[in-house]
Swiss-Prot record:
Residues 2-146 form the Globin domain. Keywords: Heme, Iron, Metal-binding, Oxygen transport, Transport. It comes from the Eukaryota. It comes from Chrysemys picta bellii. It holds the Pfam family Globin. InterPro entries: Globin (IPR000971), Globin-like_sf (IPR009050), Globin/Proto (IPR012292), Hemoglobin_b (IPR002337), Hemoglobin_oxygen_transport (IPR050056). This is Hemoglobin subunit beta. Signal peptide: none annotated.
Amino acid sequence: VHWTADEKQLITSLWGKVNVEECGSEALARLLIVYPWTQRFFSTFGNLSNAEAILHNPHVHAHGKKVLTSFGEAVKNLDHIKQTFATLSKLHCEKLHVDPENFKLLGNVLIIVLASHFTKEFTPACQAAWQKLVSAVAHALALGYH
């Protein structure tokens, strides 16, 4: 992926303001609520029976933070996203058998979360840069399936 200086700046400046715990938890919860079939990958998380249960589930909260923390590695390594996610790709492909389409869904949910948290800063140019980033991360995570 080729990044312009403007794209890198838009991504890193917004990332510096992101509360990883809050946004990560919200993004994963939204994924599980909006796309309920994704819940099958989280069978050990306990009660995911409704939106309220998901929003208050400590496992969702903790894993959302973990997911967004790893996403931060992409922000730090914009020029090496494939290598950054090689191990996670292998895990999600070979052990967890996660449908790679779910990576795209999570990326799109993350865009919505960021837009809702950073209404003024999340300009169309910022959205375009972040959309490019979440697409690159989804692609890198799906490489283990090819």
